[in-house]
From Swiss-Prot:
Keywords: Cell membrane, Glycoprotein, Membrane, Phosphoprotein, Transmembrane, Transmembrane helix, Transport. This is Solute carrier family 52, riboflavin transporter, member 3. The keyword Cell membrane applies. Plasma membrane transporter mediating the uptake by cells of the water soluble vitamin B2/riboflavin that plays a key role in biochemical oxidation-reduction reactions of the carbohydrate, lipid, and amino acid metabolism. Glycans are attached at N168. It comes from Rattus norvegicus (Rat). It is a multi-pass membrane protein. The keyword Phosphoprotein applies. Residues 1-6, 59-71, 127-137, 236-294, 351-353, 412-421 are cytoplasmic.
Length: 463
């Protein structure tokens, strides 16, 4: 029975971000099909941030109208919306409309907004719901959340989404070049001059045909969202599924000073250290957290999510592609593997020391800084063209994700043991950090264009 519950919680957690993560890993294929081309990621960034109105509304409702909103029907609603949107996306993703004389993917963008609304709102509804279950299930929830990035990445890897190869292209000195604007690579259309001149050749990147279409990919996402909906329904039928709800959150003004600890039967007596079954005592006495410690925890939650959800994902292609498509796909896939593995670690090696978690945050930030530096140096970062550079960038991305994933899990466990309202504000901090990170990077990448891309096959950094 316990194993089944862990499985249901894992599947439930997987549904939190599986839809948007699926869209991101499918982008290399979508940008070659939709009229927005390589501007599509910019559109999605704006759309996803607009969807933060969902968690903002939920948080404000509980702040000013406590008790008027239960998380259970809200979760059922957003999961049904997410499943329906995925199914519609499978059949409507390529539909375009004319707006001001240009074609735009209106159906795709509108459905993406609903998927983003589902995933963003999950941060302030799924976590409070998890407070109804014993503490050790929260780690399983975060494992499922990590799988929400891994499973779509593996499917996209099997599909061959965005896989490129280097091909020889012959041309004459008199060739007329006509760039194709729908690709980011240097693929061009050429009109050969009639004069007989010596032929020259060079390497260019070409996209390989995917093994299956986006239709099947989005249907698989629909299946995963449907599994999450079924898992939540079954969790509701568990004995604790009817215990309390978000209605009792924030009955009084909620500030860092007024978040109350759980009853003594749930967290132990005031001032006593919290213990986990079979794991011995932990380093932080949850009931004795001071306002300054709570402020530190929420600040770290926002900072970590700003890095992992907003800042670094915006520059992953710039930091990895100069080392080649293999390094890029390994860093994307293995970092997705590192997240759920890091979420497993607290089961065996829990450490609630805020000092330790702070040091681990600094360490993860260091790996993120290396990734950002390589992106800023693109298209010719350190050790470009050397196997050591490829190994370093892949390891750096893996360790960056692993360190900060562990921090997120342990901070969530600490806040869960303090109160259910603390988990609600934890979800709000997650979304706030993600929003700040995305809004910070959008002008740097898309307006100021501080990062430069290049075609790996024709890249020459020997100068």
């Amino acid at each position: 029975m316990a194993f089944l519950t862990h499985l249901l919680v894992c599947v439930f957690g997987m549904g939190s971000w599986v839809a948007i993560n699926g869209l991101w890993v499918e982008l290399p294929l979508l940008v070659t099909k939709l009229p927005e081309g390589w501007y599509l990621p910019s559109y999605l960034t704006v759309v996803i941030q607009l969807a933060n109105t969902g968690p903002l509304l939920v948080t404000l409702m509980h702040r000013f109208r406590p008790g008027c909103l239960s998380e259970v029907p809200v979760i059922f609603l957003i999961l049904c919306v997410g499943t329906t949107a995925c199914i519609l996306l499978a059949f409507l993703w390529s539909m375009t409309s004319w707006i001001q004389g240009r074609q735009h993917s209106v159906a795709f963008i509108v459905l993406t907004f609903f998927l983003a609304l589902v995933d963003c709102t999950s941060s302030v509804t799924f976590l409070p719901f998890m407070s109804q279950l014993p503490t050790y299930y929260l780690t399983t929830f975060f494992i499922g959340e990590g799988l929400s990035g891994l499973l779509p990445a593996l499917v996209a890897l099997v599909q061959g989404s965005g896989i490129t190869t280097c091909v020889n292209v012959t041309e004459t000195p008199g060739t007329t070049l006509n760039p194709v604007t729908t690709m980011e690579t240097s693929i061009t259309q050429r009109t050969l001059s009639p004069s007989l001149t010596p032929l020259t050749w060079h390497l260019e990147s070409r996209y390989l045909a995917p093994r299956f279409s986006p239709l099947l990919f989005f249907l698989l996402l629909s299946f995963l969202m449907g599994c999450c909906l079924v898992a939540f329904f079954l969790l509701q039928r568990q004995p604790w599924g009817r215990q309390g709800s978000i209605e009792d959150l924030l009955h009084s003004q909620v500030t860092l000073h007024s978040i109350k600890p759980r009853d003594t039967e749930d967290t132990g007596s005031v001032g006593a250290p919290v213990s986990s079954p079979g794991k011995g005592s932990v380093e932080v006495s949850v009931a004795s957290l001071r306002p300054a410690q709570l402020a530190f925890i929420y600040s770290v939650v926002a900072f970590v999510n700003a890095l992992t959800n907003g800042v670094l994902p915006s520059v992953q292609t710039y930091s990895c592609l100069p080392y080649g498509p293999v390094a890029y796909h390994l860093s994307a896939t293995l970092s997705s593997v590192a997240s759920p593995l890091a979420c497993f670690l607290p089961i065996f090696l829990p450490n609630r020391s805020l000092l330790f978690l702070g040091v681990l945050t600094v360490l993860g930030t260091g790996f993120g800084t290396y990734n950002m530096a390589m992106a800023a140096m693109s298209p010719c970062p350190i050790l470009q063209g050397h196997w050591g550079g490829e190994v370093l960038i892949v390891l750096s991305w893996m360790l960056f994700v692993a360190c900060l994933s562990y921090v997120k899990v342990m901070l969530g466990v600490i806040l869960r043991d303090r109160s259910r309202s603390a988990l609600l504000w934890c979800g709000a901090a997650v979304q706030l950090g993600s929003l700040i990170g995305a809004l910070l990077m959008f002008p740097l990448v898309n307006v100021l264009k501080l990062f430069s891309s290049a075609d790996y096959c024709s890249l020459d950094c020997s100068a």
